[in-house]
UniProtKB/Swiss-Prot annotation:
This is Glutamate-1-semialdehyde 2,1-aminomutase. It is an enzyme of class 5 (isomerase). The gene is hemL. The keyword Cytoplasm applies. InterPro entries: 4pyrrol_synth_GluAld_NH2Trfase, Aminotrans_3, Aminotrans_3_PPA_site, PyrdxlP-dep_Trfase, PyrdxlP-dep_Trfase_major, PyrdxlP-dep_Trfase_small.
C-alpha cells in the first residue's frame, strides 16, 4: 500500500469519511485521495514523493501559487506578535481599507472566518434590513453549508448526489426558492408569486460549484433589475470569483452592482477568512450599530488579516489578471484541440483564472441541466489518467479548475500534452 492509502485507512477510523470536507474523499471519482506533504508554486507534492501540476489551488485561494514568499513572510512576522487578541487591530482597519478600495460597491465590510459565514451573515442581514423571510438561490449553485442554502446545492452536495441535505428542517427550506441559473423567467415567476416576501437573491456570478458556468449576457443585469422592481437586495457571492475573474471581481467584469458582496478564498491568501459588505445603509443595520446580530471569536484574526493583506497587495499588481487570462485561455484552447484530434466531444468554459471541463456532445453548457447531462463516467476515467500523468484536477465533475500566476506556459503545455496522451486512450 502507498503511504496515502495507509493514511486514508487510518483517517477513516477517526474522521467521518477520512476527510474534513467531503469532496476531498474522491467520492466523485473513486479511488484513494492523495495526502499532501507540501506545495510550492504551481505544484503539489504527496506523501509518496510524487509531484503534480495543481489546478485545484486549495479550491481557489492560491491565485499566486503555493507558498508565496510575501504571504509566508507576512504570516511569520504577524505570528511573532501573537496569534489572537480578541480585540481590534490596526491590520483589520488596513484590510478593510484595501478591500473597499479594490471593490468599489463595498462601502463597508465585516470580516468573518469562512465563505459560509459570509453568505449566511449576508442573508441574515438582508432579511433583517428588508423585514422579509424568503430568499432566491439557483440550482447547482453552492453558497456554503448553512441550512437555508443546502437546497438543490452544488459543489460536494452534487458530487455526493444529495443536493438537498438531510438535517435541514422543512420549515427552514420552505423559505428558500430555487430558480434556474441563466433563466430570468424563472426568477420573475418567483417574484410574481411572492412579490412582498423575498428579501434577496444570492447568486454566484460565475457558477463555480457545478463546474464552471458563466452567466449569459442578460442574466446578472436582469437580476439587478428584478431586485430593484420588487424591493429585494442582490447578493453576489464572490467567494470563488472575487479577485480572480477581475481585480474588483466578477461584478466588475460583467458590469453589475450588488447591494451586498460575499468574499472568501483569495481574501485570506490561504488562511481561513471570509468577508461580506456593501451599501452603507444596509451594513449599518449590523450589530453593534444595528439590530442584526453577527459575531465571531476569531473574526479579523491578526494572522489571517496579515496573510490576506499581503495576498491582495500582490494580486493588485499590474499584469496579474492578464497573466491568469492568458494561461487559462491557452489551457482551454489546447484541451479542445487535443480532444478534437482524438474525436472526444468536449466543452471547456473559462473566465479569467477559472475553467471547467465538460464531456458532452452539446455545443455549450449554460445551466444545471446541461451540467447534469454531461458524461461523468468519462470524467472519472480522465481524472485518474491525468493524475497518473502528474496533473491534479478537481476530483469531481462538478468543481471548477483554478489557475495561478505561478503556472508557467511550460506547465500549461505539459498539461495539454498529458491530455493528448489521455484522450488517445480514453
Amino acid at each position: 500500500m502507498s503511504k496515502s492509502e495507509n493514511l486514508y485507512s487510518a483517517a477513516r477510523e477517526l474522521i467521518p469519511g477520512g476527510v474534513n470536507s467531503p469532496v476531498r474523499a474522491f467520492t466523485g471519482v473513486g479511488g484513494t485521495p492523495l495526502f499532501i506533504e507540501k506545495a510550492d508554486g504551481a505544484y503539489l507534492y504527496d506523501v509518496d514523493g510524487k509531484a503534480y501540476i495543481d489546478y485545484v489551488g486549495s479550491w481557489g485561494p492560491m491565485v499566486l501559487g503555493h507558498n508565496h514568499p510575501a504571504i509566508r513572510n507576512a504570516v511569520i512576522e504577524a505570528a511573532e506578535r501573537g496569534l489572537s487578541f480578541g480585540a481590534p487591530t490596526e491590520m483589520e482597519v488596513k484590510m478593510a481599507q484595501l478591500v473597499t478600495e479594490l471593490v468599489p460597491t463595498m462601502d463597508m465590510v465585516r470580516m468573518v472566518n469562512s465563505g459560509t459565514e459570509a453568505t449566511m451573515s449576508a442573508i441574515r442581514l438582508a432579511r433583517g434590513f428588508t423585514g422579509r423571510d424568503k430568499i432566491i438561490k439557483f440550482e447547482g449553485c453552492y453558497h456554503g453549508h448553512a441550512d437555508c442554502l443546502l437546497v438543490k446545492a452544488g459543489s460536494g452536495a452534487l458530487t455526493l448526489g444529495q443536493p438537498n441535505s438531510p438535517g435541514v428542517p422543512a420549515d427552514f427550506a420552505k423559505h428558500t426558492l430555487t430558480c434556474t441559473y441563466n433563466d430570468l423567467a424563472s426568477v420573475r415567476a418567483a417574484f410574481e408569486q411572492y412579490p412582498q416576501e423575498i428579501a434577496c437573491i444570492i447568486v454566484e456570478p460565475v457558477a463555480g460549484n457545478m463546474n464552471c458556468v458563466p452567466p449569459l449576457p442578460e442574466f446578472l443585469p436582469g437580476l439587478r433589475a428584478l431586485c430593484d422592481e420588487f424591493g429585494a437586495l442582490l447578493i453576489i457571492d464572490e467567494v470563488m470569483t472575487g479577485f480572480r475573474v477581475a481585480l474588483a471581481g466578477a461584478q466588475d467584469y460583467y458590469g453589475v452592482e450588488p447591494d451586498l458582496t460575499c468574499l472568501g478564498k483569495i481574501i485570506g491568501g490561504g488562511m481561513p477568512v471570509g468577508a461580506f459588505g456593501g451599501r452603507r445603509d444596509v451594513m449599518d443595520a449590523l450589530a453593534p450599530t444595528g439590530p442584526v446580530y453577527q459575531a465571531g471569536t476569531l473574526s479579523g484574526n491578526p494572522i489571517a488579516m496579515a496573510a490576506g493583506f499581503a495576498c491582495l497587495n500582490e494580486v493588485a499588481q499590474p499584469g496579474v489578471h492578464e497573466t491568469l487570462d492568458e494561461l487559462t485561455s491557452r489551457l482551454a484552447e489546447g484541451l479542445l484541440e487535443a480532444a478534437e484530434e482524438a474525436g472526444i466531444p468536449l466543452v471547456v468554459n473559462h473566465v479569467g483564472g477559472m475553467f471547467g471541463i465538460f464531456f458532452t456532445d452539446a455545443e455549450s453548457v449554460t445551466c444545471y441541466q446541461d451540467v447534469m447531462a454531461c458524461d461523468v463516467e468519462r470524467f472519472k476515467r480522465f481524472f485518474h489518467m491525468m493524475l497518473d500523468e502528474g496533473v491534479y484536477l478537481a476530483p469531481s465533475a462538478f468543481e471548477a479548475g483554478f489557475m495561478s500566476v505561478a503556472h508557467s506556459m511550460e506547465d500549461i503545455n505539459n498539461t495539454i500534452d498529458a491530455a493528448r496522451r489521455v484522450f488517445a486512450k480514453l
